[in-house]
Amino acid sequence: MSDINATRLPIWGIGCDPCVGDDVAALTTRGEA
């Protein structure tokens, strides 16, 4: 899932490594397409 997370970062403009896990969890919960 590292690749997916890396792809998410630039899209959401987060750019924070420690936040990756939390963000992915939130995205999964939201079920964003």
From Swiss-Prot:
Family per similarity comment: Belongs to the MSDIN fungal toxin family.
Propeptide: 1-10, 19-33
Cross-link Cyclopeptide (Ile-Pro) residue location(s): I11-P18
NCBIfam families cross-referenced by the UniProt entry: amanitin
Keywords: Thioether bond, Toxin
Coiled-coil zones: none
Protein name: Beta-amanitin proprotein
